[in-house]
Amino acid sequence: MGIHSNNYDIEDTQFGTSFGYCRPDEFISVKKVKLPKRKIHKTPRLLIADSYTISSNLFASEEAKEKSVYYITYRRVLEKVNHNLYNKGDNRIVFTGLSRILDYLFYEPITHEEIDETKRFLADKKVTTKGLKPMYFPEELWRRIVDEYNGRPPIKIRAVKEGSVVYPNEPVVIIENIPEGFGELAAWFESTILKIWASCEMVTQLAHWFEYCKSIVYHVYRDTISKDQVKFLAGLMLHNFGCRAGMVPQESEWLAADALYIFSGTDTFSGAYQAWKNSGEAAGIASSVFALAHRNVQGFESEKDCHEKLNSVAEDGSIDSHVADCYAYFDTVENILLPLAMQNAIEENGKVVVGRPDSGDPAEQVLWLCKLAHKHGLSTVQTILKKEWRFGTSMKFIEGDGMSWEKMKEINEDLILHGFPPFAWGLYGVGGGLRNELARDNFSAKYALCAIGKELKPVCKFSETLEKTTLPGPFKLLRSKEALESMKTVVFPDEPGEDVMVDYFNGADIWEPFKEGYNDDFLTIKQRIQDQMETMPLTLSNMDNHNYPTSDKIKEVRIQLLKKYAPKKLAQNYS
C-alpha cells in the first residue's frame, strides 16, 4: 500500500479490470472527506422535556403516579389577542399540529441506548450546596417502556380532529397514562406537545384573515358570483414570505406547511414539500412565481437588462415578481416595468409584470402603481351593481415590506376608495408578519392536570388571574346542536352526549400505537377547516358562563373544589 502525506484521510483501493482503465496490478488512491465532529446531535427523547418534569416522579403523589389525566386548552378570547385581526365576538380557534408532534416524539421507538445516554447526561445536572449531583429520573419506568411497550410510552392521547374549530377553555387534547404507575409519563412531554399552540395560532390567524379577504371580494361582487369564486379570489390575496423569517429552520418549515391550509402561495418550499407529501403529492397544494432578488438586479450593469432578462425567459402567461426598489422605485416602475408590461399587452402573451417595492411608503407605492397602470391602459373597467371598478391586466403589485394586518387593511381601504379591487391588482407577501406576534400567551395555552387516581378524582387550579384558572375533569367534548346552542359543550364522561374526540396515540397498544386522529391527510384537514369555519358558531361565550362553556355539573364540582382549596375567593367568578 502506498504512503501519502497530505491533509486528507486517504484509502488505497485496488480496482478490477472491469473499470477498463487500470490493470489488475494497479492501485488507485481514493480520498475520503475529512469531517469535524457534528454540531447537531440527536437528543434522547427522555430529554425533550422540562427538567422539573424529568425528576417529578420522585415527589409526585401516589394518586397522581397511579393515574393522571391532563388536558390542553386555550383560555383567552381572541379579541384580546389582536383587535386588528379578530372581530369582537368571534372566538373560533382552528386546531392543528398534533399529528406532526406525535410523529416527532414517538414514530421511532425509544431505545435502551437513549436511556443510557440520558443517564450519562444527568450524572451531574442537579445543583446542591454540596456540589453537583445526579439528577433523578425514573429509569425503571423507561426500561419497562422499552422492554414491555416496544419503546413507546403507555399513554393515550385523544383530541379533536385536526382542522376542527374549537373555543376558549374547551379541552382540545386529553393525555392520560394507561397502566397504573405511569402517571408522571402523561406529563413528561408537556412542554413539547403544548407547542401545538404555534400551529393552531398560525392557522387561526390566517383563517380569520381569509374571512376578511372574502369580505373584500364580496364588497365588490356581492351575490353576482358564486361562493366558490369568492373563496378562490380571496385565496389569492396573501403569499407566505416566511422562509427567512423563522428563528430556526424547523419553525419555518412546520409553520409554512400549516399556512398552506389557508393560502396556497408560498416561498417556503421546505414547508410546501411537507404539505405535498402529506396530501399524497396532490397538485395545487402550493405555488409560487419567478421573482427577482436585489442581488439579481445588482448583478447586472444595467438594471433594465435584469428586468428584461426575466421577462424574456418567462413563458407566455408567466406572472413574474420584479423587485423595483434596488435603486429608485418610482423610476424603475415607470421607465422599465411599465414599458415591459405595455409590450406584453401588445403581444398578448399573457405575461404579468409584478412590481414589488421593498422599502418606502407601501400605501403610496401600491396606489401609485395601480393609477399608473390604469392611466396607460393596463386595466379593464367593469360596472358591477352600478359601481365602476378597474381591474388590472399586465401590470400588478406585490407588497411585502413589513406587512401587518393593520397595514394591509389600510392599503385595501385606499384601493377600494379609488375603485381598484385589491384582489384584481395584486397580493401581499407576508413573512415575519405571520410569525413575529405568535406567542403561547396569546391564546394562554395550558397543559393542565384535571383528574388523578383510580377513581379519577377531579382537580383544578384557581389562579390569581381569573382567565388562568382550569377545569376539573376528565371530560367529553360535545358538538351536538343542543350543546352548541346552550353553550355547554364540556361535560363529564358520565353525562349525556357523544364525545367528538378521537384517539391519536396509544402506546399501550404495542403493535398499532398510532390511531384514527393521526391518519388524516393534508387535504382532509384543509377541507375540514373550510367546512367548520363556515358552519360553526362564532363563539361559545356569554354573560352567564364567564367564557367557560361547561355543563352545570362541572361548575358545581368546581365550586366544591373552590370552597375546599380557595374559600376566600368569590364563587360567583367560577360558576
Regions found by a protein language model. Name each.
Residues 16-110, 268, 274, 278, ...:
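Gly/Ser/Thr/Ala-enriched C-terminal appendages of enzymes
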Residues 107-150:
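Short beta-strand/loop turn elements enriched in aromatics
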Residues 104-105, 121, 125, 192, ...:
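Residues that form generic nucleotide/phosphate-binding pockets
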Residues 1-14:
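Terminal presequence/propeptide segments associated with secretion/organelle targeting
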Residues 9, 16-80, 140-154, 158-385, ...:
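Buried, small/hydrophobic-residue-enriched core segments of structured protein domains
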